[in-house]
């Protein structure tokens, strides 16, 4: 059993093996042997071509080959499977190869195929030093096919020269000639091993060869430029790309090589291709790309796109330009709009002006627009006639802030105040009118007789010899000539009044007391002080910077100290006289057309030439107001201004104490600056200010300042920062606000009352003055006038009297308030008649001793020693310690 089973398995294996081997031996199962007759002839002469090579290709592989005989016929046998496509190719030397497909539907019994070979045309070979050119031998009007390449790319065989070379260039000029080229079936290899066959649509074809003498091809390396003209009926256009194909004789098919460009040469289109080698080339299009690959020039193909981009950019630039023009127009129109705002009616002007950095002028006291007062102001007092000179005295007063050198401070906001809308000072008539029912109120001219005391004051503030300063030496007041200049100025201002005192007899005690009583009334009642205390203290800090307001008046009368520099005031004394208003002397200004400018002055002989020179430069209209010569002025009783100056000089020789540190009521300032006091103060120094500031400023008008600051709580000037106040709103609602950091405390009635209470200690030194004050009724606070006190140059380090020491930069302009400290006489001519009537019986005032005059001059000389310490200050310190307040009448 085992043997029989093994035998069966062997037989089964043998049968399986035979079946497998039989299957493997018959791959072309169904293929039959077929004989094909091929006839080869000349395409141009139709003559048979002998010895032509015939090959049959299937799938790029040769399956059969043969040679034609003398009659050009060849019989080729091969195995053919039905459905396969064969390529029959015939080639011979000096002929363009040709091929044709063969694919029968059924297996034929007999089959014949004819192929015509196109003879290659000889070409003109031209070898240059750098280029080798091959041109078609047929020259004509139309462009000819041409090929050129670099000479160095030619590889000549051994024992071969250029004379042994033969060039052939054949181009298909018609569709029939294109058919003489091999069958146009292209093979597109994608580099992955997968190839696709395409039937090509030819455009043109060319064959180029370079042969040696024995007929072997000569190799050419490098780019070969092939140019072939196209048919006139071609549908191609300029800048079109057409695929180039190369014929491979080993594969019997066309291989894709690259792209050729179509150019326009006159009226003829040409196809140019850069070939890697010589051979058979055809320009044809494949079915995947049935049309030419057209690539137009960027200037024509992208014209619309480029125009759209340029149009968009132009539109954007136009919009930006319009925005820029609009912005510039608004910038240019802003100053005009601001100028138009300043021309608004009087009712809206003050509320429309800028409160922070505007350079416009807003009157400080009682100013009105010309529209409200079209004519000259007439000041009447209950039926009294208008006095001459009142119109000049009622000019608007302005606050200005200037640097010590005379230049405007451009970095500080400007503060402007107008009391034209305040309830307390609603009109000039209410301030200047004397109410008949209030008999205790007297005018400013009641202090002295009308015709004489005013001349005394004019003599004390008349022109003094100012030393000319160049603009670059504005801060160089510490020169050696400064001492003589300052001393001569003090002598000129103080000598007339002191000589007047020497000539005058003893004055009546009661008269002087009456003057001081009327001019500086006693403190108001406790009920009024309590009413002032009711003002909320938090109002000063409750508002933002843009809504701060200037109060309409100070809580209580304070001290008005006129000095050359705020920082020279002793801190201890400065706090004892709170609240105090310190005004630098060299910031007082007056208009050039004031009536008291050119009043003659009696001066020493050594100063007469300087004074006459300055007076000659004044305008002629000012010279005719006071034609009286100085020799006609008669001695008159000394004013209370001189008495106040004498108080200060006597106080400078004594040590200050809490009992005598406080100023008397004659040195106090009422609730706020009034027009009479300011007009009197400014009228005295107009001549000095106008000439001195023009000389010190180099003849150029000083720029307007931007802010003013007043410190009444004892702070030094360096601690007062810059800010601004909404001043206009203060006049309407009576707010008690002040600048956040100006140092002004408007709710300090206790210190003010203490200052008035302590003032009695100073007045005890002059009992005749106090007795006379008690005889006359007291004037209300609203009409009390300000006594300007000038703290002359007393050395600060040697005493604690609170006097100031002028800095070198301030000494040249300290004279601008000197006259204010010498006088408090009447500035309203309309009120001087009453003064004459009330003081006609008053005896002469006691003369001032020569010792007092020498003491004032010695104190000024001692002041120069302290000026040297100011040189060590940096420009920043000088800027931060500059004076706080300036008055200017415009």
Swiss-Prot record:
Q: Which organism is the protein's source?
A: Pongo abelii
- The UniProt transmembrane annotation reads 304-324
Q: Where in the cell is it found?
A: Cell membrane
Instruction: Please list the residue ranges that the record places on the Extracellular side of the membrane.
Output: 22-303
Free-text function comment from the UniProt entry: Involved in the regulation of the cytoskeletal dynamics, plays a role in actin stress fiber formation.
Assembly and interactions? Interacts with ADAM10, NSG1 and OAZ1.
Q: Where is the composition biased (Acidic residues)?
A: 858-869
Q: Region (Disordered) spans which residues?
A: 730-759, 818-890
Which keywords fit this entry according to its UniProt record?
A: Cell membrane, Glycoprotein, Membrane, Phosphoprotein, Signal, Transmembrane, Transmembrane helix
Task: Report membrane topology.
Answer: Single-pass type I membrane protein
- Which residues, if any, are the signal sequence? 1-21
Q: Which family, according to the similarity comment? A: Belongs to the FAM171 family.
Please list the residue ranges that the record marks as compositionally biased, kind Polar residues. 822-833
What InterPro entries does UniProt report for this protein, alphabetically?
FAM171 (IPR018890), FAM171_C (IPR049175), FAM171_N (IPR048530)
Assigned GO CC terms: plasma membrane
What protein name applies here?
Protein FAM171A1
Q: What is its main location?
A: membrane
Sites of the modification Phosphoserine? 358, 360, 371, 422, 443, 525, 849, 855
Residue stretches of biased makeup (Basic and acidic residues) = 747-757, 870-883
Pfam families per the UniProt record, alphabetical: FAM171A1-2-B_C (PF20771), FAM171A1-2-B_N (PF10577)
- GO term, biological process aspect, one: stress fiber assembly
